[in-house]
Amino acid sequence: MDKDSTYYFIGIKGSGMSSLALILHDEGYKVEGSDIEQYTFTQKGLEAAGIKILPFDPANLREGLTVIAGNAFTDEHPEIKKARAMGLKVIRYHELLGQMLDKYTSIGVAGTHGKTSTTGLLAHVLSGLDKTSYLIGDGTGKGIPDARFFVFEADEYRRHFIAYHPDYMIMTNVDFDHPDYYKDLADVESAFQQVADQVHKGIFAWGEDESLRKINTSVPVYYYGTKENDDFQATNISRTTTGSEFDVIHKGEKLGRFTINLFGEHNVLNSLAVIAVAYFEKVDLDLVQKELLTYQGVKRRFSKEAVADNILIDDYAHHPSEIKATLDAARQEFPDKKIVAVFQPHTYSRTAALMDGFAKSLSLADQVVLTEIFGSAREDAGAVSSQDLADKIGNNTKLIHQDDLSAISDLHDAVLVFMGAGDITKYENAYKALFK
């Protein structure tokens, strides 16, 4: 990499792109980028670092730039076309990240669900114990030139994680998602097998996932979970309204009892994966326990605030399995309150392909409210609607619009769980504005 060049990020507000931009900035590289003008939660960190954010415009491009192209954009994007026409070096996000890993003990976190939460937890724990660079999918990134560890989120979309050859990899689960790219579950499984073959030292995988049990590769695969056949087993689990406690057993030996101020079974599993990695890197597990206790979570993952006499939870969940996990966590922390799911379906292809799963998982809430479907940069229309999903759920499921929140405006002493990967926060802000 060249410190005389300026690294120009096309799509700098993207969750991974903003994280990578922050890492390069921390390591002393010159960084700027472009994106849509609409405010996104990721730009706060970029602005705090003094990184210039420009509106998309081919005129932004000039000699001396190294262009980092966001994976959300095709080669037909006007800025990418202009960069290539000018002869500028153009690197895709995942390619640059892959090039950076060799300097560290690198630990990737892959999985259809739970990547960001687990990456954030691992980064927090290791940062408290040794120098650690990290890239988290919530727009958070930190670069330390002489770091021991590099923790990063490895995205399976379009097989982008094939660019990575890490020392270790955590695999949280394998599920069918991204139906605009993957044909079926077997197609997703083949991608995870491919990246497993590129790991140098070891893989830590959730033991109850049938797809992950099929992984067959040259490095050891250590399974974690709650069953006796798992290499790292969580036992004597206690889930309360303040968090969870559990023992960790490895090869018949109790490694310790651990406490987390987090909710939901998935956070016990995420913590178990982190403990397993720390164990193999010979990190003091008493210190790991102390770091686990101070973890507050990542952005847009079960973020809570009080609004009037209600609790508002903001979460990125946009797949049936994630919705189930988020509602499970809400039930654990607030067992005596009404749970209201406010969900923004994300992409038409995913909504159509996983319709039955969405209906089943959302039905775990006491009440369901839907917004219109959020399209994407790749897909802005489809033959399915939120009303189709509402009809599938039944149980008086309602639809809301940003200027008509009547379905939720009169709720009292309830927990409103806003979920989605699009712009669901605009509905949250409109709701909060009712009480100002």
Curated annotation (Swiss-Prot):
The annotated pathway is: Cell wall biogenesis; peptidoglycan biosynthesis
Where this protein primarily resides, as one coarse class? cytoplasm
Q: What is its EC number?
A: 6.3.2.8
Q: What processes does the entry annotate via GO biological process terms?
A: cell division; cell wall organization; peptidoglycan biosynthetic process; regulation of cell shape
Q: Where in the cell is it found?
A: Cytoplasm
Sequence positions that bind ATP: 111-117
Give, as one word, the top-level EC class. Answer: ligase
- InterPro entries (alphabetical): Mur-like_cat_sf, Mur_ligase_C, Mur_ligase_C_dom_sf, Mur_ligase_cen, Mur_ligase_N, MurCDEF_pg_biosynth, UDP-N-AcMur_Ala_ligase_MurC
Report the Pfam families cross-referenced here.
Mur_ligase, Mur_ligase_C, Mur_ligase_M
Annotated GO CC locations = cytoplasm
- Molecular function as annotated in GO: ATP binding; UDP-N-acetylmuramate-L-alanine ligase activity
Keyword field = ATP-binding, Cell cycle, Cell division, Cell shape, Cell wall biogenesis/degradation, Cytoplasm, Ligase, Nucleotide-binding, Peptidoglycan synthesis
Out of the domains of life, which is the source?
Bacteria
Catalytic activity of the protein: UDP-N-acetyl-alpha-D-muramate + L-alanine + ATP = UDP-N-acetyl-alpha-D-muramoyl-L-alanine + ADP + phosphate + H(+)
Q: Which cysteines are joined by disulfide bonds?
A: none
Relate the protein's function as given in its record: Cell wall formation.
Report the family membership.
Answer: Belongs to the MurCDEF family.
Q: What is this protein called?
A: UDP-N-acetylmuramate--L-alanine ligase
Q: Which organism is it from?
A: Pediococcus pentosaceus (strain ATCC 25745 / CCUG 21536 / LMG 10740 / 183-1w)
